[in-house]
A protein has these predicted regions:
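Conserved residues at the C-terminal ends of beta-strands
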Residues: 1, 79, 152
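N-terminal carbohydrate-binding/catalytic regions of secreted carbohydrate-active enzymes
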Residues: 1-16, 20
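Glycine-rich, aromatic-flanked loop segments that form ligand/cofactor-binding clefts
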Residues: 14-32
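Conserved, mostly hydrophobic/aromatic
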Residues: 24, 76, 149
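Short, flexible active-site loops
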Residues: 150-156
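Active-site cleft segment of glycoside hydrolase catalytic domains centered on the general acid/base Glu
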Residues: 4-5, 33-146, 158-169
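Positions that flank functional sites
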Residues: 28-29, 81, 154
Length: 170
């Protein structure tokens, strides 16, 4: 993970090199992936209302710092590989309404600072159309805001030639 200052410095450097910018909020003190969605230590002990507010404030703070540095990310990912949710345990898919409230706080914070940035919701196992369908059907049912579907696909971890095109075409 990177601090806000490190993120801004890298984004400025990448933009100066002509690269398109994507920011990925893991909302964790360490790498977040399907098996690890531990919220930051500083957020432990917060009630759900406080957790929503701190997620919004953190996202807005980073996005505003990027804007102030002249960087407009083309894409912003709210959560990293979140098939079972993010910011555990409150943001688990065991409680879709709460997860969607957190996702929407991230979305709103991004759009407030950078209206043109496209917000991504990112799920792994792109070859598993049933999983994608279940996840995005629930996200839609509960009102999740997003602009783009993000998909991870790791063929070297899978047997045979798994097909990811069903998830893309669906």
């Amino acid at each position: 993970h990177c601090s806000k200052d490190e993120t801004v410095a890298m984004a400025v450097r990448a933009q100066k090199a002509g690269m398109r910018i994507m920011i990925n909020f893991h909302y964790s003190d360490t790498w977040a992936d399907p098996a690890h969605q531990t919220k930051p230590k500083a957020w432990e002990g917060l009630n759900f209302e406080q957790l929503k507010e701190v997620l919004y404030t953190y996202t807005a703070d980073v996005m505003t710092a990027l804007k102030d540095a002249g960087v407009t990310p083309e894409w912003v990912q709210v959560g990293n590989e979140i098939p079972s949710g993010m910011v555990y345990p409150e943001g688990s898919t065991d409680n879709w309404p709460q997860l969607v409230e957190l996702l929407n706080k991230g979305y709103d914070a991004v759009k407030e600072a950078s209206p043109s940035s496209q917000v991504i919701l990112h799920v792994d196992q792109g070859n598993n159309n049933e999983r994608f369908r279940w996840w995005f059907d629930n996200a839609t049912k509960y009102g999740a805001k997003y602009d783009i579907i993000g998909m991870s696909y790791y063929p070297y971890w899978l047997e045979g030639k798994p097909d990811y095109t069903l998830s893309i075409d669906d």
